[in-house]
Swiss-Prot record:
Swiss-Prot/TrEMBL domain comment: The PTS EIIA type-2 domain may serve a regulatory function, through its phosphorylation activity.
Stated role: Seems to have a role in regulating nitrogen assimilation.
Keywords: Cytoplasm, Kinase, Transferase
Entry coiled-coil feature ranges: none
GO MF annotations in UniProt: kinase activity; protein kinase activator activity; protein-N(PI)-phosphohistidine-sugar phosphotransferase activity
Superkingdom of source: Bacteria
Protein name: Nitrogen regulatory protein
GO biological process, one term: phosphoenolpyruvate-dependent sugar phosphotransferase system
InterPro entries (UniProt xref): PTrfase/Anion_transptr, PTS_EIIA_type-2_dom, PTS_Nitro_regul, PTS_SugarTrans_NitroReg
Lineage, top ranks: Bacteria, Pseudomonadati, Pseudomonadota, Gammaproteobacteria, Pseudomonadales
Pfam families cross-referenced by the UniProt entry: PTS_EIIA_2
Domain PTS EIIA type-2: 6-150
Classification via Gene3D superfamilies: Mannitol-specific EII, Chain A
């Protein structure tokens, strides 16, 4: 079973990210992934994330969003985690603005693996103590380490 810590890197874990709007956050996600993985085009990632949002918001409540999409040319899942400097409206189910985002990009053919990763993220973020730890992470490295620690039962 693939685990979140296997597809997330410290370089794709960011704190104090300027938000502004849902669209701007999705652009920043696309640019972040394309910067670290230049084989992917930021505009394509952005368009796929926007298309997925049009199907229904990935804002799940409690200030959390899990933007995700399938991506042509993607061979294995890619994740990122961002803590925004200020919450943004993400059309979340509970109406609350979002400040914590877990991103999941998967191959076009991904099915069960994609769903398993979404389950892992949702289960982790369902815990108030984990959300508090993530929100209080002072650095990108600390944010990444919290995800790893939680995945390892700490």
């Amino acid at each position: 079973m693939i685990r979140l810590e296997q597809i997330l890197t410290p370089g794709r874990s960011l704190v104090n990210v300027p938000g502004g709007s849902k669209k701007r956050v999705l652009e920043q996600i696309a640019n972040l992934v394309a910067r670290e993985l230049p084989e992917f085009d930021a505009q394509t990632i952005f368009e796929n994330l926007v298309a997925r949002e049009k199907l229904g918001s990935t804002g799940f409540g409690n200030g959390i969003a899990i933007p995700h999409c399938r991506l042509s040319g993607c061979q294995s899942p890619i994740s990122a985690v961002l803590h925004l400097d200020a919450p943004v409206d993400f059309d979340a189910l509970d109406g609350a603005p979002v400040d914590l985002l877990f991103v999941l990009l998967v191959p076009e053919a991904a099915t069960e693996e994609h769903l398993e990763l979404l389950r892992q993220i949702a289960a982790m973020l369902d815990r108030a103590d984990v959300r508090d730890r993530l929100r209080s992470a002072p650095t990108a490295e600390a944010l990444y380490q919290i995800v790893v620690d939680v995945q390892n039962g700490q």
